[in-house]
Amino acid sequence: MTKEQKLQLAEIRTMIPEMRRVECIHFVGIGGAGMSGIAEVLLNEGYHISGSDMAENTVTVRLAQKGAEIFFGHQASNVEKASVVVVSTAIDPSNPEIVAAKENRIPVIRRAEMLAELMRYRHGIAVAGTHGKTTTTALTTQIYSEAGLDPTFVNGGLVKNAGTNARLGSSRFLIAEADESDASFLHLQPMVSIVTNIEADHMDTYGGDFETLKQTFIDFLHNLPFYGQAVMCVDDPVVRELLPQVSRQVITYGFSDDADVRLINYRQVGQQSFFTVQRKDRTDLDIVLNIPGKHNALNATAAIAVATEEDVEDEAILTALLNFEGAGRRFDQLGEFETGNGSAMLVDDYGHHPTEVDVTIKAARAGWAEKRLVMIFQPHRYSRTRDLYDDFANVLDNVDVLIMLDVYSAGETPIAGADGRALCRTIRGRGKIDPVFVPTIEALPPVLANIIQEGDLILTQGAGDVGKLAKQLASMKLNIEIMKKLG
């Protein structure tokens, strides 16, 4: 690289000025939501970005169009130009690209380490918690953007208003989803940390010990400087339990009477949520939030608490929430279609933990009480299905019709008795509903064609490839005749 080229890049690379020796950053598994977001921000910083994945998707297409070099399949030659290799915990250490990088003394770092470098020179706002991270990150981003603060953001899902899951902004603010699934959020050193809730999930990371998980969240909060800010949902019993152990300034939020930022008078009409937020020494805010569910009202209140501390104008908060389009695959309304047997509404949701499924069902019931709720559920990971088996059974029999797919393994080995067929059998045995087991996504459309009725709300639910199924059903407009032909 010439001296002139180095000077040009120095002008562009404002986020991590000390990374001047880094030219090419390679991402193993670049098509994932978390990886692609960081890659896109660094691409906009002027770095040469390369990455590999097993197959093309909308993310890899977008990155390629922006100038990234994309490889399909994993091989040692992919890292020849790399100054550093970024990996997620989903990538096996025996991956040939990781092996080649280590043999050639190319640094191999985790995704969160690179995110931490992006955050190091910025006012970082990290959003953590078992549930609600993606939506809360999107809501906070929307408010800051509406206020003209032009934040950089890196989210685990699509921010619909922005049309992307990551963007390089011009201000000092960086808003990012903080992932506890592999404890890698401990690399982050933000100025503000949100904790939405804490439940048992990803327990393999924590040796099956919930106390270890709780301590990890405390350690995450103590990564804040002494002048930093923790924003914590006091409605969550585990978060409330941990409050006395947090030695940083804390703002609490929730429906609880003792919350510093309190949500009251909640009601839902269709997809919109209406509620009032009370803040100490500030005017109450009467909110219209353009997404359904009490859980999303809580997510919005977290974002309001953060924005209020930054003295964001109330008008910007109100406008941002009214115009919020949601996050990708979070109660994502794909349309209402004439099926050939009346009209039906199609909604897609990423929730894959019993608590997430439960609040999604409640939001659907509250907004569309007159509709029959038909859920197509795909369990995610055998270990999660095993660990939360009874909780899944308790939640899933609250729909009117349940179509159960088999487990999306996410690379795990099958566990006896922790699959879709077994879960289906357990729910049937309770006598409340009679679920239908469909072993593959390919076999589902003709089954659905025989189930769908006038006025149904069809809800595809899960973190696996059931999201692709939702898009397929939308492309067919839920047409019964088309779906039958796929049988």
UniProtKB/Swiss-Prot annotation:
A matching Pfam family: Mur_ligase
The UniProt record lists the keyword Cell wall biogenesis/degradation: yes
Keywords, ordered alphabetically: ATP-binding, Cell cycle, Cell division, Cell shape, Cell wall biogenesis/degradation, Cytoplasm, Ligase, Nucleotide-binding, Peptidoglycan synthesis
Enzyme Commission no: 6.3.2.8
Coiled coil: none
GO molecular function: ATP binding; UDP-N-acetylmuramate-L-alanine ligase activity
InterPro entries according to UniProt: Mur-like_cat_sf (IPR036565), Mur_ligase_C (IPR004101), Mur_ligase_C_dom_sf (IPR036615), Mur_ligase_cen (IPR013221), Mur_ligase_N (IPR000713), MurCDEF_pg_biosynth (IPR050061), UDP-N-AcMur_Ala_ligase_MurC (IPR005758)
Superkingdom per UniProt: Bacteria
Electron transport keyword on record: no
Pathway as given in its UniProt record: Cell wall biogenesis; peptidoglycan biosynthesis
Compartments reported by the entry: Cytoplasm
Signal peptide residues on this chain, from the entry's feature table: none
Annotated ATP binding sites: G129, T130, H131, G132, K133, T134, T135
Gene3D superfamilies: Mur ligase, C-terminal domain, Mur-like, catalytic domain, NAD(P)-binding Rossmann-like Domain
SUPFAM superfamilies named in the record: MurCD N-terminal domain, MurD-like peptide ligases, catalytic domain, MurD-like peptide ligases, peptide-binding domain
Major localization listed first in the record, in broad terms: cytoplasm
GO biological process terms held by the UniProt record: cell division; cell wall organization; peptidoglycan biosynthetic process; regulation of cell shape
A GO CC annotation given for this chain: cytoplasm
Catalytic activities: UDP-N-acetyl-alpha-D-muramate + L-alanine + ATP = UDP-N-acetyl-alpha-D-muramoyl-L-alanine + ADP + phosphate + H(+)
HAMAP family: MurC
Family under the similarity heading: Belongs to the MurCDEF family.
Protein name, entry field: UDP-N-acetylmuramate--L-alanine ligase
Organism: Aliivibrio fischeri (strain MJ11)
The encoding gene: murC
